[in-house]
C-alpha cells in the first residue's frame, strides 16, 4: 500500500474492534459472491413479526426494474427501536437532549421514550391518521421530532420530514406532492440564539391555493412565542397527550411497505420524494451504524445532523435506536455561542462517537484551535464525517484538534437515495488516507464507468455507479416511478448512477470528486441548480439565470449565479441584495446565492443549451484553459463574463 499520508489502524482499536482487515475481506467477499446467504444471516439482526424466507429480488434493468428485500417478512420499525430494548434496557438513556441554550437539558430513557411514542401514536390516530397516510413533520431539533417519526412508524403512517430551514413555498410543494392530511410542527425553534418561526412558516405554506389536503396541524409548545391559531385545524400537542393511552400495539408492516418519504433536490426543479421501505432499510441502517462506528453497548453517540436530512433519519433515529444506543440530540449549532461549544458538549455528555460534517469542521478551523485549549475529549473514540468529501486539511485538523490523534476517522460516502453508508473505512479494518472514503461496505459493488458506460478497471477516474442492489436502497420517487427509472437507471444501462464522480487509487480506495450532474453541495446539503434558477427567474426583473457551484472555503461549494436582467433594468447592488433575499424566501436560507454576476448574455449552443462547464470554470476562477468554445452561438460572451467575474484571486 502506498504510504502517502497513510493513517494505520491503531493496535488498541484493532484489538477490540468488531471487524479487523482479514474479517472485512472475508465478509465483503461473501456479501458479493453470495448476497442471499450473507443477508439471510444479517437480516436477523432486527426483530421480525413474521420471519422472512425470501431475501432478494432485484434487477437494475431499466425495462424490468425490481428492488425487493426480505420481502415476505413483516415487522415494525418503532418496535425495533423501542419495544425490543424494554426487557433488559428500559432504564438506559435513549436520548440526551441539550437545547440551544446549554442550561436546558433532558434525559429520556427507553422506557419513557416508548411511553411517549405510544401516547403520540394514539394521538395521531385520534386526529384521523391511518396506515399509509403521509404525515408532514416540520420540527426543531427536539426529542419530540423523533417521537413524531417513531409514532408514525408505529401505526404504519408514512412520515415526510421537512428541514426546519426550508421556506413556506418549499414546504407547500412537499405537502402538495404527498397530499398530507396532518402536519406536525412547533410554535418556534431555537437555533444560534434566534427563534425560528416554524408555525408561521407552516401557516404561510398552508395558505398556498394548491394545498387542499391538510385537516389538522399539531403544534408543540417549544418557546411559548406568539403564534396565529386556526380554530378547528390547529391543536396543541400537549392537549392531545392528556387523554392518550400509553399502550399502542405496533402495526404489522410488510418489509416493502413504505416507512418514510424524504424530499431531495434533483437536477430538475421539482423536489423528488425519495421513498424508503421498512425491512431492508432497518437492517441496513442498524448494521451500518454498528459496524461503521464500531458501536459498543452503552456508548454515547452524537450525530450533529438535522433530523430533516437523511443522516438524521438513519444515524440519529433509526440506526442508533435500533441498536439501543444513547443518542445526543442538540437543538442549536455546535459553534454557538462560541466555537468551544462542540468540545464542551463532548466533555459534558462524555460522547464516545461523533458524526459531523466537513462544513462545521472548516468553520471551526477558521476560528482557530485556541477554542479547544480547555477541551479534554478523552471519552471520544470514533469520529465520522458526512455530507460531502472532506478536504485533507480539514481531515487532519479534525484528527489532531478534536480527535487528539487517537480517534479513527470514518469518512462516509452515501446519499439520501441509498438509505445508509455505502463507501467508508471500518475503524478496526481500514488504514485511512485523508480525503478518501476508502472501501465499500458489505454488499456494495461500486464501479467507475466512462461517459459511454464502459467499466474502467484499476487506478482510474470516472462516473461512480453501483452494480447491484443493497437493502437500504430507495424503491421509487413517490408518485413518479418513471422519474426514478430515468434519473438513476437510464444513463448507464443495468447500473445505478449516483450522479457523483470518483477516482480509484492504486490501493483500490475511492475518492469522491463531486457531482457530475446539475446538483451542488452546499454545507453538505444538496441543491438542484434548476431549483435556484427557477426562483431567480420568477423575479419580474430577471430574464434568465444560470447557477453553478464554486469552491468555497467553509461551505465546500458556494452558489454562483449569472443573471441576465430584463431589458432596460438597471444593474445595482440593491437589486443584487433583493435577489438574494428573493431566493431565500422562495427556497430557504441554504439556497441564497453567494455571488451574483450580471450577465448581458450566457454561453449557449446554437440550439439554445446553456454550456454550464464554461460557467463553472469562470466561477472557479479557472479561466486560462476553458476548452473548445466553437459550438457556442456567440463565443464573445465568454470574454465578457471572464472580464466581469466576481471570484477573482489576483
UniProtKB/Swiss-Prot annotation:
Keywords: Acetylation, ATP-binding, Ligase, Magnesium, Metal-binding, Nucleotide-binding. One of its GO terms (biological process) is acetyl-CoA biosynthetic process from acetate. Pfam families: ACAS_N (PF16177), AMP-binding (PF00501), AMP-binding_C (PF13193). GO terms for cellular component: cytosol. Mg(2+) binds at residues 537, 539, 542. CoA binds at residues 191-194, 311, 335, 523, 584. Acetylated. Deacetylation by the SIR2-homolog deacetylase activates the enzyme. The modification N6-acetyllysine is found at residue 609. It catalyses: acetate + ATP + CoA = acetyl-CoA + AMP + diphosphate. Transmembrane segments: none annotated. It is an enzyme of class 6 (ligase). Gene3D superfamilies: 3.30.300.30, N-terminal domain of ligase-like. ATP binds at residues 387-389, 411-416, 500, 515, 526. GO terms for molecular function: acetate-CoA ligase activity; AMP binding; ATP binding; metal ion binding. Its cofactor is Mg(2+). Belongs to the ATP-dependent AMP-binding enzyme family. This is Acetyl-coenzyme A synthetase. It comes from Shewanella putrefaciens (strain CN-32 / ATCC BAA-453).
Amino acid at each position: 500500500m502506498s504510504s502517502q499520508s497513510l493513517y494505520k489502524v491503531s493496535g488498541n482499536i484493532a484489538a477490540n474492534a468488531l471487524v479487523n482487515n482479514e474479517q472485512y475481506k472475508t465478509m465483503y467477499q461473501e456479501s458479493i459472491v453470495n448476497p442471499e446467504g450473507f443477508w439471510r444471516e444479517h437480516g436477523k439482526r432486527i426483530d421480525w413479526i413474521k420471519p422472512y424466507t425470501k431475501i432478494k429480488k432485484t434487477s437494475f434493468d431499466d425495462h424490468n426494474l425490481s428492488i425487493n428485500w426480505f420481502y415476505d417478512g413483516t415487522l415494525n420499525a418503532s418496535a425495533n427501536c423501542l419495544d425490543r430494548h424494554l426487557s433488559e434496557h428500559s432504564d438506559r438513556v435513549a436520548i440526551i437532549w441539550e437545547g440551544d441554550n446549554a442550561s436546558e437539558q433532558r434525559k429520556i430513557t427507553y422506557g419513557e421514550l416508548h411511553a411517549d411514542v405510544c401516547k403520540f401514536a394514539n394521538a395521531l390516530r385520534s386526529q384521523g391518521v391511518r396506515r399509509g397516510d403521509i404525515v408532514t413533520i416540520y420540527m426543531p431539533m427536539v426529542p419530540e421530532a423523533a417521537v413524531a417519526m417513531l409514532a408514525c412508524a408505529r401505526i404504519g403512517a408514512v412520515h415526510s420530514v421537512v428541514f426546519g430551514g426550508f421556506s413556506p413555498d418549499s414546504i407547500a410543494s412537499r405537502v402538495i406532492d404527498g397530499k398530507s392530511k396532518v402536519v406536525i410542527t412547533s410554535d418556534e425553534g431555537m437555533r444560534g440564539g434566534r427563534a425560528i418561526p416554524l408555525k408561521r412558516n407552516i401557516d404561510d405554506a398552508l395558505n398556498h391555493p394548491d394545498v387542499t389536503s391538510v385537516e389538522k396541524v399539531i403544534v408543540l409548545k417549544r418557546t411559548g412565542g406568539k403564534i396565529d391559531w386556526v380554530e378547528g385545524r390547529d391543536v396543541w400537542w400537549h392537549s392531545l397527550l392528556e387523554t392518550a393511552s400509553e399502550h399502542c400495539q405496533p402495526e404489522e408492516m410488510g418489509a416493502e411497505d413504505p416507512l418514510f418519504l424524504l424530499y431531495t433536490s434533483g437536477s430538475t426543479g421539482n423536489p423528488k420524494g425519495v421513498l424508503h421501505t421498512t425491512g431492508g432499510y432497518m437492517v441496513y441502517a442498524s448494521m451500518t451504524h454498528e459496524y461503521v462506528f464500531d458501536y459498543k453497548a452503552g456508548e454515547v453517540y452524537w450525530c450533529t445532523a438535522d433530523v430533516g436530512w437523511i443522516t438524521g433519519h438513519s444515524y440519529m433515529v433509526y440506526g442508533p435506536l435500533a441498536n439501543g444506543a444513547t443518542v445526543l440530540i442538540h437543538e442549536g449549532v455546535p459553534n454557538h455561542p462560541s466555537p468551544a461549544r462542540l468540545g464542551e458538549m463532548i466533555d459534558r455528555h462524555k460522547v464516545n462517537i461523533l458524526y459531523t460534517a466537513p462544513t462545521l469542521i472548516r468553520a471551526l478551523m477558521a476560528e482557530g484551535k485556541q477554542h479547544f485549549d480547555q477541551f479534554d475529549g478523552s471519552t471520544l473514540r470514533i469520529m465520522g464525517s458526512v455530507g460531502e468529501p472532506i478536504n485533507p486539511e480539514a481531515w487532519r485538523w479534525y484528527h489532531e484538534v478534536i480527535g487528539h490523534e487517537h480517534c479513527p476517522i470514518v469518512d462516509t460516502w452515501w446519499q439520501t437515495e441509498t438509505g445508509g453508508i455505502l463507501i467508508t473505512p471500518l475503524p478496526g479494518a481500514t488504514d485511512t488516507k485523508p480525503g478518501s472514503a476508502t472501501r465499500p461496505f458489505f454488499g456494495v459493488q461500486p464501479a467507475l464507468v466512462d461517459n459511454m458506460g464502459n467499466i474502467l478497471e484499476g487506478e482510474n477516474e470516472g462516473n461512480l455507479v453501483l452494480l447491484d442492489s443493497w437493502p437500504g436502497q430507495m424503491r421509487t420517487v413517490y408518485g413518479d416511478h418513471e422519474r426514478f427509472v430515468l434519473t438513476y437507471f437510464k444513463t448507464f444501462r443495468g447500473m445505478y448512477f449516483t450522479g457523483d464522480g470518483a477516482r480509484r487509487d492504486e490501493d483500490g480506495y475511492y475518492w469522491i470528486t463531486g457531482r457530475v450532474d446539475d446538483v451542488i453541495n452546499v454545507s453538505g446539503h444538496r441543491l438542484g441548480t434548476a431549483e435556484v434558477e427557477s426562483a431567480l427567474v420568477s423575479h419580474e426583473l430577471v430574464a434568465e439565470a444560470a447557477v453553478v457551484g464554486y469552491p468555497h472555503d467553509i461551505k465546500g461549494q458556494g452558489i454562483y449565479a449569472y443573471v441576465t436582467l430584463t431589458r432596460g433594468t438597471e444593474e445595482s447592488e440593491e437589486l443584487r441584495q433583493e435577489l438574494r433575499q428573493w431566493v431565500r424566501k422562495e427556497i430557504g436560507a441554504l439556497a441564497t446565492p453567494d455571488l451574483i454576476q450580471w450577465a448581458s448574455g450566457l454561453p449557449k449552443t446554437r440550439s439554445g443549451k446553456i454550456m454550464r462547464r464554461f460557467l463553472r470554470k469562470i466561477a472557479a476562477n479557472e479561466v486560462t484553459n476553458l476548452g473548445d468554445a466553437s459550438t457556442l452561438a456567440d463565443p464573445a460572451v465568454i470574454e465578457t463574463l471572464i472580464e466581469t467575474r466576481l471570484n477573482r484571486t489576483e
